[in-house]
UniProtKB/Swiss-Prot annotation:
Pfam families: PGI (PF00342)
Keyword field contains Repeat: no
Any one GO molecular-function label of the UniProt entry: monosaccharide binding
GO biological process, one term: glycolytic process
Gene3D superfamilies per the UniProt record, alphabetical: 1.10.1390.10, Glucose-6-phosphate isomerase like protein, domain 1
UniProt name for this protein: Glucose-6-phosphate isomerase
NCBIfam families: PRK00179.1
An example Gene Ontology CC term for this record: cytosol
Source organism (scientific name): Brucella melitensis biotype 1 (strain ATCC 23456 / CCUG 17765 / NCTC 10094 / 16M)
Length: 549
């Protein structure tokens, strides 16, 4: 069926009415009255548990949300994506990051062409190159083994590889991985300063080989290599992830060190492609294939499972409920796993660049809120930074906890138990809160004077009723990481379909880039600032004055 705008609008209205009527409901009372609540509002896929029972929903909520998914034709749009249809309508492109991890023998067609053999060819080339670097068969220009790789990219060419490489640290042997993204010269200077060009491989990740930040840093790195080892050494110390073979050749990188990908792969969905080359070199081709396999398992589940048993669909529906119906403007991603410390930033781009839109697929203004602000930090660090606001602030911010049942350090299992206890405690505290009477009783138990009890008790009240969901997996390994990332990718897709927006373009990044190009000669003093707004003129004048001071 096609998207039913009339039914969609009616269901949204029913959801808003339902929220207004059920909002005062106390979550502690809901759990006390319903021992089966956890069982009804949780799902498992193998070892992965998704629990949303601490969100402010009931059976009517879930029935209406499923009705919403049907009206939005989530299943039809999902089928269109997997079939290679051009669902990215503003750029007239297919959206097939799922093909990058498809290990089946089925055809995946884009405009009549089966792309799976192309995907396999690039993956095999990546594996051969990674094995060569890791084994020392592919050496630097002076004959030394490569001990360090530096990935130069930005956005999707950086956030995914950084996140995955850090997350899979227990699977590293060598070489060491480093990442440069910012145009700020301090980033590349600090990265290169402790390294030796003779044992360093630099990967330049830019599809067009024109991305200003990436190419500026790449030229700096090229000069670093050439000044030390000579111009002829450049080819042995660089590789590229790009489709612009002419530009790559002009830079000095041999074609056999160039790895391409396709326009049906968006940047924020590209870690599965050649963009993941630094990850593959760091953890090895076998582990990278396990990473792909985990994502593919989630793809199959998302494609085949019924709506009410489908983890990405349920996660997306809860996300929509929080954003569009409850009116919560942000969501906090809190992985209780230090190695997932870059996951919030990765999901920030995935979600906000995808669903930060204000027009519908047909170019009309949206009728309600779209994607939330996404942010977060790993636990327990966040508890000592911003959890105060989450517990007692005036804004309700849903939390998404992620934790593993087991860690990689068996001799430190007691610390992992403390980590898990903190994660579950925060989830429980947000839901239960603490009443004024409970705060008084706690203070009275300390034999404090009555006046002090009355003075302090209001400050120790927690409203509770603050929603959170929890994802638990066995252990963070390549398969688990791939499955987790694919879960969030498909969650974003589901929310976008209900919002009625295109999750696969990013025109919002263009205007600032255009103006930066115009302003560069102004900032450098080659052109004047006349014709620009008074604020920009004043800022330019101040910068010029301070640079001369």
């Amino acid at each position: 069926m096609a998207r039913d705008a009339t039914k969609l609008e009616a269901t949204v209205a029913k959801l808003k009415k339902h929220w207004a009527e059920s909002a005062p409901r106390d979550m502690r009372a809901a759990f006390s009255a319903d021992p089966g609540r956890f069982g009804r509002y949780s799902l498992c896929l193998d070892d992965l548990l998704f629990d949303w029972s601490k969100c402010r929903v009931n059976d009517e909520t879930m029935a209406l949300l499923k009705e919403l998914a049907v009206a939005a034709d989530v299943e039809g749009r999902r089928a269109a994506m997997f079939a290679g249809e051009h669902i990215n309508n503003t750029e007239d492109r297919a959206v097939l990051h799922v093909a990058l991890r498809d290990t089946s023998s089925k055809e995946v067609l884009v405009d009549g062409h089966n792309v799976l053999p192309d995907v396999k060819h690039v993956l095999d080339r990546m594996a051969a190159f990674a094995d060569g670097i890791r084994s020392g068969a592919l050496k630097g220009a002076t004959g030394r083994k490569i001990t360090d790789i530096v990935n130069i990219g930005i956005g999707g060419s950086d956030l995914g590889p950084v996140m995955a490489t850090l997350a899979l640290a227990p699977y590293h042997d060598e070489p060491r991985a480093h990442f440069v993204s910012n145009i700020d010269g301090a980033h590349i200077a600090d990265t290169l300063s402790p390294l030796d060009p003779a044992s360093t491989l630099i990967i330049v990740a830019s599809k067009t080989f024109t991305t200003i930040e990436t190419m500026t840093n790449a030229q700096t790195a090229r000069k670093w290599v050439a000044d030390t080892l000579g111009e002829a050494a450049v080819g042995a110390h660089f590789a590229a992830v790009s489709t612009a073979l002419d530009k790559v050749a002009a830079f000095g990188i041999p074609e056999d060190r160039v790895f391409g990908f396709w326009d049906w792969v968006g940047g924020r969905y590209s870690v599965w492609s050649a963009i993941g080359l630094p990850v593959m070199i760091a953890v090895g081709p076998d582990n990278f294939r396990k990473f792909l396999a985990g994502a593919h398992a989630m793809d199959v589940h998302f494609r085949d499972a019924p709506l009410e048993k489908n983890l990405p669909v349920m996660l997306g529906l809860i996300g929509y409920w929080h954003r569009a119906i409850c009116g919560y403007g942000s969501r906090a991603i809190i992985p209780y796993d230090q190695r997932l410390s870059r996951l919030p930033a990765y999901l920030q781009q995935l979600d906000m660049e995808s669903n930060g839109k204000s027009v519908t697929l047909d170019g009309k203004p949206v009728s309600g809120p779209t994607g939330p602000v996404v942010w977060g930090e790993p636990g327990t660090n966040g508890q000592h930074a911003f959890f105060q606001l989450l517990h007692q602030g005036t804004d309700t911010i849903p939390l998404e906890f992620i934790v593993a049942a087991k860690g990689h350090e068996p001799t430190l299992d007691h610390q992992h138990e403390m980590l898990m206890a903190n994660c579950l405690a925060q989830s429980e505290a947000l839901m239960k809160g603490r009443t004024l009477d409970e705060a008084r009783a706690q203070l009275q138990a300390k034999n404090l004077p009555a006046s002090q009890v009355e003075r302090i008790a209001p400050h120790r009240v927690f409203s509770g009723n603050r929603p959170s969901l929890t994802l638990i997996h066995d252990m963070l390994d390549p398969y688990t990481l791939g499955r987790l990332i694919a879960l969030y990718e498909h969650r974003v897709f589901v929310e976008a379909q209900i919002f009625g927006i295109n999750a696969f373009d990013q025109w919002g990044v263009e205007l600032g880039k255009e103006l930066a190009t115009e302003l560069l000669p102004v900032v450098s003093g080659k052109e004047g600032a006349s014709g620009r707004d008074a604020s920009t003129q004043g800022l330019v004048a101040h910068l010029h004055a301070r640079r001369k001071a």
